[in-house]
Amino acid sequence: MLNFVILGGTMKFAKSAGIFAVILSLASMTAVWSAAAQDQHKAQIDALRKSLEKYQDYKVAVRDLYLSTVGCIHYSGEKIAGHMEYAKGAMGVHFVNLTVKGPPDPMKPNVLIYEPVGKKLKLVAVEWLVPVTPETKQAPTLFGQTFMGPMEGHEPLIPKEFVHYDLHAWLFKDNPLGMFAATNPKVNCKGYDFELLEKPTRMMHGH
């Protein structure tokens, strides 16, 4: 009887050890896949950053049909039920290219974002704005990131009827909240002639 109990315990231990080994193997494979995906995204992001360097001069952006919405947007961190949650910080001055349409192109964001620094504008981030249409089935993704939304347009700069998804990428300024966060606490709108403290945008459920 004792031998059976010991043998049974050994069998259980071996079975548990086998399951544990499988779990470790799967975890290792997942880590490898994740690292490979991150490397791929990093290569894409590095290529994107390099291709956009020319827009450090906002006049080049304007010539390429990125038009300024003038206001420097920032948020207080206020939370309102049914609205997007934006951490305290700024988004900056948006330059929108209305000629860029269709599914989000990782190498062609339709928004460039600048921070006013003294009398100049410094390129700090980019954004992809994707309007919600009857054909939209789910939130888009880029670089392994799911777009935020759907939400109304950011009044007064964008009509609230412009229901959309968006994704920011802070390619040219470090963001302690993360590269793909909507706001950046290191971006400053204070002293800018067209400083706009916005309320969080209303979420649009059911789209």
Regions found by a protein language model. Name each.
Residues 1-10:
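Short, Lys/Arg-enriched N-terminal segments with co-localized hydrophobic residues
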